């Protein structure tokens, strides 16, 4: 289903000489530039009553711009009563702590029982917001914090904040191998040339930057704290694999079990049985899209990663050798 919207604004004198698409973006700030340009090209925007479809048309100031368009509801997806771990909620946003084995958006691999289905059940008006308010995603087996918009204006502003890199997203991870220092990875990411469900570092890919620092050393693993500067699909997983330090448990990107020499049977079994990428979105900080208040949220590291960290720490302690 869809619902009709009709909006009117008058071009400001200060916008004299601007392109129409630029003027429209400044006047109708509740919607993204890409959405407004799409409406413009589809003939859904009129200037003084005349439909204009050329983005480069210049405005003079004083023109009345009218938008008549449809907003698609997300009602093509079923509302499902699924548990949501809600960290924070108000009239404009929801912050959730996503567990493992929970897909964010329906797709070819999974048509329902996703975060989106749960959101539609929890707050039915969110069906009027594109993608049910989802502005960024976590992989199925990545745990941690996500922010969701409950209104179109909130969604537009959050998307812009992400694009401007005004949203801080930090992750906790366990990677394979010993890393001696932190750093930054600035490598473009694109679709894998042969494995189409995976991504890879590619000169033809999109700009991608990940910052990381070492939080703790183990014998054959390292605990990291990472910060996303961009938000590409599988970004941390791809970048760490590129450094030849894939995430523990991430078999898709080379994270095969590596057992420390002389490890106990219990630790050996834990490492072999760890069946997801050891990655958790631990901190999320951003300005509230309506009030402007700075918000910061933290999600405790899940039990499976805590238990693995404790086991690796104990192994390192037991096998520490003195240097002379």
Swiss-Prot record:
Gene3D superfamilies from the xrefs? Pseudouridine synthase, RNA-binding S4 domain
Q: Where is the active site?
A: 139
Subcellular location, in the record's words?
A: Cytoplasm
What GO molecular function annotation could you give as one example from this UniProt entry? RNA binding
Give GO cellular component annotations, separated by semicolons.
Answer: cytoplasm
Record's catalysed reaction(s):
uridine(1911/1915/1917) in 23S rRNA = pseudouridine(1911/1915/1917) in 23S rRNA
Q: Which Pfam families match?
A: PseudoU_synth_2, S4
Record-level GO BP terms: enzyme-directed rRNA pseudouridine synthesis
The EC number of this protein is 5.4.99.23
Query: InterPro entries this protein is in?
Result: PsdUridine_synth_cat_dom_sf (IPR020103), PsdUridine_synth_RluA-like_CS (IPR006224), PsdUridine_synth_RluC/D (IPR006225), PsdUridine_synth_RsuA/RluA (IPR006145), RluA_PseudoU_synthase (IPR050188), S4_RNA-bd (IPR002942), S4_RNA-bd_sf (IPR036986)
Where the record annotates domain S4 RNA-binding, the positions are 18-91
Predominant localisation class: cytoplasm
Arranged from A to Z, the UniProt key words for this protein are: Cytoplasm, Isomerase, RNA-binding, rRNA processing
Cited SMART domains: S4 (SM00363)
Q: Which residues cross the membrane?
A: none
What PANTHER family does UniProt report for this protein, alphabetically? MITOCHONDRIAL RNA PSEUDOURIDINE SYNTHASE, RIBOSOMAL LARGE SUBUNIT PSEUDOURIDINE SYNTHASE D
Similarity comment text for this entry: Belongs to the pseudouridine synthase RluA family.
Function, in words = Responsible for synthesis of pseudouridine from uracil at positions 1911, 1915 and 1917 in 23S ribosomal RNA.
Supply the name of the protein: Ribosomal large subunit pseudouridine synthase D
Q: Which organism is it from?
A: Vibrio cholerae serotype O1 (strain ATCC 39315 / El Tor Inaba N16961)
- Gene name of the encoded protein: rluD
């Amino acid at each position: 289903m869809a619902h009709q919207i009709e909006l009117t604004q008058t071009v400001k004198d200060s916008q004299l000489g601007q392109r129409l698409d630029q003027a429209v973006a400044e006047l109708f700030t509740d919607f993204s530039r890409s959405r407004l340009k799409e409406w413009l090209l589809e003939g859904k925007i009129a200037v003084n009553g005349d439909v204009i479809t050329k983005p480069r048309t210049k405005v003079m100031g004083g023109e009345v711009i009218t938008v008549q368009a449809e907003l698609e509801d997300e009602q093509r997806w079923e509302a499902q009563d699924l548990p949501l771990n809600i960290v924070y909620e108000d009239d404009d946003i929801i912050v959730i702590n996503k567990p493992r084995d929970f897909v964010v958006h329906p797709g070819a691999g999974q048509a329902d029982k996703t975060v989106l289905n749960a959101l539609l059940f929890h707050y039915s008006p969110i069906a009027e917001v594109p993608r049910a308010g989802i502005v960024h995603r976590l992989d199925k087996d990545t745990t941690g914090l996500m922010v969701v918009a409950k209104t179109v204006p909130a969604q537009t502003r959050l998307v812009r904040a992400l694009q401007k890199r005004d949203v801080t997203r930090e992750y906790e991870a366990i990677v394979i191998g010993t890393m001696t220092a932190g750093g930054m990875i600035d490598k473009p990411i694109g679709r894998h040339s042969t494995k189409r469900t995976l991504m890879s570092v590619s000169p033809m890919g999109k700009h991608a930057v990940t910052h990381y620092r070492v939080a703790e050393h183990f014998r054959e693993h390292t605990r990291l704290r990472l910060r996303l500067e961009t938000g590409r699909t599988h970004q941390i997983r791809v970048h760490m694999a590129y450094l030849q330090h894939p995430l523990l448990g991430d078999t898709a990107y080379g994270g095969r079990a590596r057992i420390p020499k002389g490890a106990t049977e219990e630790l050996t079994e834990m490492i072999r049985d760890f069946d997801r990428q050891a990655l958790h979105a631990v901190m999320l900080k951003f300005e509230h899209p309506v009030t402007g208040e700075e918000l910061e949220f933290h999600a405790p590291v899940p039990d499976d990663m805590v238990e693995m960290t404790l086991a690796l720490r104990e192994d390192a302690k037991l096998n520490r050798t003195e240097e002379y």
